[in-house]
C-alpha cells in the first residue's frame, strides 16, 4: 500500500481535519488537546508504552468488530478492547482510574468485568505488536471523523502517582457556557487532556455540570484552589470544583458513569455542515439530474426511509468506490473519505480464495452533503496508477 500517497491526500485536506471540536458539542478534544505532541514526539514514551494506544471519543454504537477492523487495517494487533459499561460500584472507579492513566492492562473476555456487552463508554485500547504500527495508527487515525465524533488516538501514558486522580467535577456552570469556554477557564492551571459538558439527552441543553481532566494531579489541585467557589463570567452563583474520582467521595462513581453513559447524544459534528435540514428538490436534482420537484423540507434523514433514493440505506448514504487496487484495504477508504465528514463504516470486497480486494468497496456516510462532496471530489481521483470511480450505490451496483 502506498502510505505516502495516502498521507498526501490527508495533507491536502488538512484545513478540514485539523480544526477539531472547539464548541460545546462534547464530541471530541478541543484544538488545544488535539494538537498536543504525543509522548513519542516528546521522547516521553517508554518501551512498554510504544505499542499501547488509548482511543477516546468513539461513537457509542461502535462495535468491537468495527473497532478492531479500523485499527487492524494499520497493522497486526496483539490485543484490542472497546470498553463497555458492564461495571458497578468501586470496581468501576478503580478500573477506570487504571485505564484512564494508561496502566498496563490485561486483556479480558467480552463478558469480563470491564469489557462487558453493555453500551460502549466511548473509549478503548489497542496494543500493537510493532511500535511502528502504533505510531502509524496515531498519524493516520488521530482526528478521524466517525459519525458525530472526532476520535483522539494517543499513547497510553505509563502509570504514575503524578497523573492519577486528575479528573475534576465542576457544577454550577452557566447553561450557556460552551466546552471551549470551559477549557479557557481551566487552561490557565495546566494542560487539559479531555473536557465534557453534560447535556440533557432530550433537549440538548447543558445541565450546568462538566468534567475537566488535567495532565497531572498537581494541576487539578491548583484549579480547585483557584476556581472553587468563584463566579465565572455569566454565572449567577459560585461554581463548585472538586475531584471527580476521589475514593472518599461516594458520588464519584455515579458521576463517572454519568459522564460516559449518556446514550444517543445529539451533538452536531464540528467539522461538517451544522445544518441537517435540506430541501428534497435539490437532493433529487443532484441524485437524478431531472427537473425540479416541488419543494419539501426534510429535517434529518429518518423521513427518507422507504424512498427509492440512490445511496440511502436508512442508516446513512452508501457510496460505491470502484477500481481499487488488489492490495487495497479498509484503511484506504477510511483515509480517503474521513476528511469529508462522518463515516459510519467502510467495506472492501475481497476475493474468497486470495483475500485480495476485488477492485471495489463501499463507504457509508451519515450526512448527505458530506457524501455528495466526497463523491464530487474523489470521482476521477487518481490513486497510484488507478483512476477511481465514485458514486452513490444503486440497485445496479455490485452487491457486497
From Swiss-Prot:
Annotated region described as Disordered, given as residue ranges: 12-48
Localization, UniProt: Cytoplasm; Perikaryon; Cell projection, Axon; Cell projection, Dendrite
Reported tissue expression: Expression is neural-specific. In the retina, expressed in the ganglion cell layer from stage 28 onwards and in amacrine cells from stage 35 onwards. Expressed in the tailbud and adult brain; in tailbuds, expression is predominant in the cortical plate.
Domain RRM: 51-158, 166-246, 317-395
SMART domains in the record: RRM (SM00360)
SUPFAM superfamilies reported for this sequence: RNA-binding domain, RBD (SSF54928)
Pfam families attached to this UniProt entry: RRM_1
PROSITE patterns for this protein: RRM (PS50102)
GO MF annotation list: RNA binding
Keywords: Cell projection, Cytoplasm, Developmental protein, Repeat, Ribonucleoprotein, RNA-binding
Biased segments, Low complexity type: 18-33
Domain of life: Eukaryota
Compositionally biased tracts (Polar residues): 34-44
UniProt cross-references to InterPro entries, sorted A to Z: ELAD_HU_SF, HuD_RRM3, Hud_Sxl_RNA, Nucleotide-bd_a/b_plait_sf, RBD_domain_sf, RRM_dom
GO cellular component: cytoplasm; dendrite; growth cone; perikaryon; ribonucleoprotein complex
Record family assignment: Belongs to the RRM elav family.
Free-text function comment from the UniProt entry: RNA-binding protein that is involved in the post-transcriptional regulation of mRNAs. Plays a role in the regulation of mRNA stability, alternative splicing and translation. Binds to AU-rich element (ARE) sequences in the 3' untranslated region (3'UTR) of target mRNAs. Mainly play a role in neuron-specific RNA processing.
Identification of the protein by name: ELAV-like protein 4
Protein's gene: elavl4
Amino acid at each position: 500500500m502506498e502510505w505516502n500517497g495516502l498521507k498526501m491526500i490527508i495533507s491536502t485536506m488538512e484545513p478540514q481535519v485539523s480544526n477539531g471540536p472547539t464548541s460545546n458539542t462534547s464530541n471530541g478534544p478541543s484544538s488545544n488537546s488535539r494538537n498536543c505532541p504525543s509522548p513519542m514526539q516528546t521522547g516521553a514514551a517508554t518501551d512498554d508504552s510504544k505499542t499501547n494506544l488509548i482511543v477516546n471519543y468513539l461513537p457509542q454504537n461502535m462495535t468491537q468488530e468495527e473497532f478492531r477492523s479500523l485499527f487492524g487495517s494499520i497493522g497486526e494487533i496483539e490485543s484490542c478492547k472497546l470498553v463497555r459499561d458492564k461495571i458497578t460500584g468501586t470496581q468501576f472507579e478503580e478500573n477506570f482510574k487504571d485505564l484512564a492513566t494508561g496502566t498496563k492492562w490485561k486483556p479480558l473476555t467480552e463478558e469480563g468485568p470491564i469489557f462487558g456487552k453493555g453500551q460502549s463508554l466511548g473509549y478503548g485500547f489497542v496494543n500493537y505488536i510493532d511500535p511502528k504500527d502504533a505510531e502509524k495508527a496515531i498519524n493516520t487515525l488521530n482526528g478521524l471523523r466517525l459519525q458525530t465524533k472526532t476520535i483522539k488516538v494517543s499513547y497510553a501514558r505509563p502509570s504514575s502517582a503524578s497523573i492519577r486522580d486528575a479528573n475534576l467535577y465542576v457544577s454550577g456552570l452557566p447553561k450557556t457556557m460552551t466546552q471551549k469556554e470551559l477549557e479557557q477557564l481551566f487552561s490557565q492551571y495546566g494542560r487539559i487532556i479531555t473536557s465534557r459538558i453534560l447535556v440533557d439527552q432530550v433537549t440538548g441543553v447543558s445541565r450546568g455540570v462538566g468534567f475537566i481532566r488535567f495532565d497531572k494531579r498537581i494541576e487539578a489541585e491548583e484549579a480547585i484552589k483557584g476556581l472553587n467557589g468563584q463566579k465565572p463570567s455569566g454565572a449567577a452563583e459560585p461554581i463548585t470544583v472538586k475531584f471527580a474520582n476521589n475514593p472518599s467521595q461516594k458520588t464519584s462513581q455515579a458521576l463517572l458513569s454519568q459522564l460516559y453513559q449518556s446514550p444517543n447524544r445529539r451533538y452536531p459534528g464540528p467539522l461538517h455542515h451544522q445544518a441537517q435540514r435540506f430541501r428534497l428538490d435539490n437532493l433529487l436534482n443532484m441524485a437524478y439530474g431531472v427537473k425540479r420537484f416541488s419543494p419539501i423540507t426534510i429535517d434529518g434523514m429518518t423521513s427518507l426511509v422507504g424512498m427509492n433514493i440512490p445511496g440511502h440505506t436508512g442508516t446513512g448514504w452508501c457510496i460505491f468506490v470502484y477500481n481499487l487496487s488488489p492490495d487495497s484495504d479498509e484503511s484506504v477508504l477510511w483515509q480517503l473519505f474521513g476528511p469529508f465528514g462522518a463515516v459510519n463504516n467502510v467495506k472492501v470486497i475481497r476475493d474468497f480464495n486470495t483475500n485480495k480486494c476485488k477492485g471495489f468497496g463501499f463507504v457509508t456516510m451519515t450526512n448527505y452533503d458530506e457524501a455528495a462532496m466526497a463523491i464530487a471530489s474523489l470521482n476521477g481521483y487518481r490513486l497510484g496508477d488507478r483512476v477511481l470511480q465514485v458514486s452513490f450505490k444503486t440497485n445496479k451496483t455490485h452487491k457486497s
